[in-house]
Amino acid sequence: MFVKKGDKVRVIAGKDKGTEAVVLKALPKVNKVVVEGVAIIKKHQKPSAENPQGAIVEKEAPIHASNVQVLDKNGVAGRVGYKVVDGKKVRYNKKSGEVLD
């Protein structure tokens, strides 16, 4: 999976298209990511001992990894490639050529 936790990404599809934010969680088994402030859903919680009223909680839902592009340090969005530098496999931005890791 080309996106990692902590990466700054731009959403390229969906209702939050154009938003730039940080990846909070990567879910490689389902190829999805949770991005800060993107795809907000409302979750209804039942009343419990600690919260007798119940609540409606807003949280981020996972979006497909193909709907985001990783930004490099200069803010250039591009596809991610892999190459070997000094015997280590690193990710790089194919558009700018800048190493991401």
UniProtKB/Swiss-Prot annotation:
Protein's recorded name: Large ribosomal subunit protein uL24
The protein's role, per its UniProt record: One of two assembly initiator proteins, it binds directly to the 5'-end of the 23S rRNA, where it nucleates assembly of the 50S subunit. One of the proteins that surrounds the polypeptide exit tunnel on the outside of the subunit.
Organism of provenance: Streptococcus thermophilus (strain ATCC BAA-491 / LMD-9)
Domain of life: Bacteria
One GO biological process term: translation
InterPro entries attached to this UniProt entry: KOW, Rib_uL2_dom2, Ribosomal_uL24, Ribosomal_uL24_CS, Ribosomal_uL24_KOW, Translation_prot_SH3-like_sf
Tagged with keyword Lipoprotein: no
Swiss-Prot/TrEMBL keywords: Ribonucleoprotein, Ribosomal protein, RNA-binding, rRNA-binding
